[in-house]
Amino acid sequence: MNVYGTKQIRNVVLLGHGGAGKTTTAEALAFVTGATKRMGKITDGNTISDYDKEEIKRQFSISTSLIPIEYEGDDGMMKINLLDTPGYFDFVGEVEEAVSVADAAIIVVNCKAGIEVGTEKAWELCDKFKLPRVIFVTNMDDDRASFRELVLKLERRFGRSIAPFQLPIRENEKFVGYVNVVKMAGRRFTNLSDYEECEIPDYSLKNLGIARDALLEAVAETSEEYMERYFSGEEFTVSEIQGALREHVIDGSIVPVLMGSGINCQGFKTLLQVIDRYLPTPDKFECIGVDVSTGERFTAKYDDSVSLSARVFKTIVDPFIGKYSLMKICTGTLKPDSTIYNVNKDTEEKVGKLYLLRGKDTIEVPELKAGDIGAVAKLGVTQTGDTIALRSAPIVYHKPQISIPYTYMRYKTVTKGDEDKVSSALTKLMEEDLTLKSVNDKENRQLLLYGIGDQQLEVVVSKLLNRYKVEVELSKPKFAFRETIRKKSEVQGKYKKQSGGHGQYGDVKMEFEPSGDLSTPYIFEERVFGGAVPKNYFPAVEKGVAESCLKGPLAAYPVVGVKATLVDGSYHPVDSSEMAFKTAAMMAFKKGFMEANPVLLEPIASLKVTVPDKFTGDVMGDLNRRRGRVLGMNSNHHGKQVIEADIPMSELFGYNTDLRSMTGGIGTYEYEFARYEQAPGDIQKKEVEERASKVDKLDV
């Protein structure tokens, strides 16, 4: 493949609901431009994008795939970097990485299915990253699909920016062509995406007039000259219309709507023309970073004449082909066999060959210029989000904003001794997927696997088995309770072993009461008079309290919020020791704790649930069933409701799946640990009974 400069490049991300036709669209574009000799099918497992075994087995995209294609546009050959993303929400991290380096988006919508949750999420992502967008309507070959109804729904949902650039032509209820609204011309498909001119059907004239007038109004708003010409009834030329519309598409005030049929490979040459004529080159945008040498803001304008800087947006780690770091060149030119400086890691690395990735295939290239996307193999320390530059010109760019994982499961190896293998394999998978996280929960003696959703975790388990030949089981995690007391108690702890010879003797009288501070295990004080307990044994008594707080007497959970006061005791001049007084204090703690109305505390989370208004009743009802307390509700800038609530952490298990079910997938949530609160009696009873064997081990 040739080397292309910034003005000849388009970086376009394919977004949309799962199953809408993104991968088929990418496949058709590759086929039409000659990048492939035949068009693969998802059902046959031979598409460019979905090459991973898990994707072939499940027949949907799991990872973002890069598909560079070449196309002869109006100004000569150009390169289009297609980023085909997953549509299922569990893999949103892949989508966010792709969107962060795209300069425009194609939102793929299935005409029959209409606006789906994935359509709305795609639109929100484009808004968040300020991406120009085109809507490409697929499945036009389905005679039950109504393009007109879909456009009306799009206008109602997304506003006046929706602009049909085409209207369908049907004969005998079959999709055979379209009307080009910009050029006011009919197009009939001949062979696949090829077409010939044809008459505009009479039934299209009314809708054509409406669509055409809307486009001309947008053209008129571009300048005062155009506005005057519009009101005087003067016609615009096609090139004037295209130039004006391009400005509106780039600033997002117009969203072209196009159409096609993936199964028949129709409409894709027109889509390529729109990418060429209306979507921006990388230099229409800026990449903001910091000049490390000065600490000042740095603005990259995709100029290949200045020093090199690039941002790594994705990492592929494959046991067979190795590690590839995918990056977008922000400034300068990256050349093979050169030395780069990883600004985040403050270290230099050697670059070997440079590649373009087309699905699983690698294409070697002599250089990568600003605005382009490519890959470098076998970088040692470089990870997703890192900036590479030259040591003499260190620039660092902001890392991509990736969704935080809130779903987690406990995992353990099926085969004893595989722990290190699993840990190594997960490290590789976490390099690829920033929404995947492994946590060693030492308190509960469990390993936790975090992700966006259950489906993602299921795929991870399958990858561990198929890629790395290690097997793990997922199960419900344990939750970290705490123990405390609700009233005051006064007890004695006496440890005495005097059966001849040097013995052991320690005697303490102590008070235990709530400290009022659940953020610390205990507060220790002493009020001993007359030397009943020598001062040199006070630290041993406190140590006994501290060790007792590690595993409480009620259910072997850590103790919090206890005030322990040493008030009296006795000692033996020969047999007393630090060990004896520590043991006596532990005996006193256990007895005093159990006499002070002990209770279990459960972890409480501060939860925010974001849903459209129509789902608020169901969501709040469900939160009440989960023992949640709704604190309030506010609207956000997307017109959705944000419900705030306190809820026990244990009740959030499985919440991701249930929330999606309640809201059709549109609902999202986030939470953070807030505090501990007393658990209901039935919860306490169950925990105490289940952990009785652990408490018995505390006997002294």
What are these regions (language model features)?
Residues 1-700:
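Structural and coupling elements of P-loop NTPases
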